[in-house]
Amino acid sequence: MPKRRQKKYFTSLPDDPQPIVHEVRHRLAFSEVDALAIGWHGHYPEFFEMAHTELMRKIGLTYDLYRENGIGAPIVQLHADYFAPLILDEFFTIRAELVWSDGARINVNYEIIKENGQLAGTGYTVQMLFDAYNHTPFVTTPPLVESVWQRWKNGEFKDL
């Protein structure tokens, strides 16, 4: 059987700021496995969210700040590919990579990496930014997010 393609979903253009990366280590819990003690595929979005939340917290975009600024950021696309099983009690790393976008959206690539370095899964999410009060999409990036994007362009997140 041919090897499935293991790729990045979003890529940067030459003039874009470098992606911002954050990793979270996690041990697969009993509540996260199926009857065969293998990580249940339905938990992968939760794993993605663990790394995503910490990455966004590090750059100053928390869910509390979204609410305070009237911003909604629902996931409108979620994709996952599975390459190797995670086993009960196994440690693994979830890697989130925020990739630059000029639009009012947030693009994040994910990798789930086993302790031995083997890639267990990859995925991505797309979040669209909208006005939380009238539920309409933002045509331009809202000021809170734009201020963080400006800091990103200025290179403030290189050492995260």
Q: Which role does the model predict for each range below?
A:
Residues 116-118:
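A glycine-centered beta-loop-beta connector
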Residues 22, 121-123:
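Extracellular and select intracellular beta-sandwich modules with Ser/Thr-enriched
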